[in-house]
């Protein structure tokens, strides 16, 4: 991606249609118009009034950092130094002044949300340095049309319509252009007065790249065409402190003040505002160092009814970090593939963009040169996605969680491989290593950017797998072989096997499958040997899982994973001509076992077993696990109830999770669908609470509390709740809510599934929580991307690149929906018995269509 390199993409300006006069629909709910949720916000509609207060919409690139556009138009959560920095609201703002109207200067933002006045950092000191004390517009409204966030400002005292559009590139299948460290704010103005008016637009910033305790390294505000660069030098001992942030515009009339008035107290800020109030335009050259802030000005004139758009572009460059995570190998068995990290330029993580651009000027040049093309293709995605006629709560849920891919939760290392946290802490990554048992749930990346998702499989079955087939469920950073000194995650490792099948079907790359299959087989054989040594077809031995504990004895959750992995091995092995007899045998035994031994007539349970196993007793095993060992009281409890942290006779929302994973990977459900459906209906009946006021949650109540509703992770409708069930059992996780909702819909229970979705999104209406930050163990938590499965659940639309076959199985009658494949994206529609495909970008070669299980010729 050199400066003058052209963007490479396959774009089809034409549409192709496959029209089939068949009944492609089932009786079901027709799509409804957006309606207010329980809390009053219209699903997928604008946020205003009380529902605006928490809105913060991420803008940035995949693994490149971000800033958020708040519902008011303010900038916050600036996180561009390769780590999260929540609540970092830098002292930056746009402003407008009208020369013909006294006292007309306004910050181009809406009213400051009330919570900031006392709930923000440094509130007890009066919030020094904040811009909140400046005049601003009286009303604001926010509309999300991912990846675009739109703010409308109004003020009856100012005859000016103002519209702000914030965005950054997001183009499915084009991972590189979607991973740029850039963003843009487009300010549009319309003169609604009856007179010609003269205006001065300005964008103003303190040097927020300056590190507060840095005395050895200089800070600067440098020049760039049409703007300025906020800059902090690094040192030989700490190169990671170097960082640049460019703010500029292509407007021909721009004038730049590179150095605000220098002085003590609030002199620089006060003098900058004095200039804005007077409508003064000042050109000031850069100084050597310690410039407190800078402004760019664009004066313009509008006749009545005329409009003006100013495009403010941002680019940043922080090429170094001090991030190195993971224990080094302790055995020759730990390193079974070449250590590619030795080829990287640093022992520490370096972001992908630093391999493509030499400095911030190169980033800005590329951004400027390709701005219109990148915007056009991002808008093409937006238009295709929002062309959907699916229920608005579904569109809202999916789009809101695509922002995770722009958050500091995700990273790309120097060689382009994808790596991620589980979520983002306030100032740290939360739970490292592309955690397999969390990222199992996330379905968006595999469809939108398949090459990045496939890099995860290459890592899991490469650097993260040892000679025995044991996988570490947390990958090192930089990615390299790592010590295998903890339990494998049963759900993560078995889920990864199913996802190899998924990546094969999405990519159509059978050569890749053939190359990785021996390592996948070694992983599967490890799972059998470790958790099903007696070949019963069930996961019996203690097994670590996504609840950060070990389950003892067979259960529906992990046994469904086991069966799904066995079925995927059978399918892949047969295609490759491999011996799969053992996998078929275990699958049949396990299917019968799960249906006959683990189903109680309403739902699948766990049979707690801790004696007669190969594993050490729970007291010994706990010494290696999270949560520490057994106290004397815990040993007494063990003798009475069995191991801590089990669910036993409980109704687990994840109780058939492996079956859902199989379904979204394109595999058949591993057990009887009638029993699966009954389990899900029991989860809906017992675990979905519309009001949690009387619910006891001694764990982490902030996810759902009080009058709010939510889907509990587990309940015990038939009794039998242990004194210490698994550690998160009383919580509510959005990723599990969407998993259950989409699985219900897959099984034809659309009403119940949408009820779960609405209950979840009602908590994220903007008045209490940020609608674009579903959190669990950290902000922008990856599990919430299970919401993407709602697309396939409602429509049955799935593209198989191996067979070049499109599958359709609508649960909502006629529809138009979004489809993304490895080679392009577009829309699939079902109207009056006809199925059509419109390719918007790239290509989607369809040779066959399966509609409700019936093969139809093109």
Q: Which residues fall in each region the model found?
A:
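Bacterial N-terminal signal peptides that target proteins for export
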Residues: 2-13
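Extended glycan-interaction surfaces of carbohydrate-active proteins
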Residues: 391-425, 451-484, 530-554, 595-733, ...
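Bacterial N-terminal signal peptides
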Residues: 12-21
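Acidic/polar, glycine-enriched structural segments that form the non-catalytic walls/loops
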Residues: 24-40, 46-51, 55, 155-159, ...
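C-terminal substrate/ligand-recognition segments
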Residues: 184, 298-303, 310, 431-438, ...
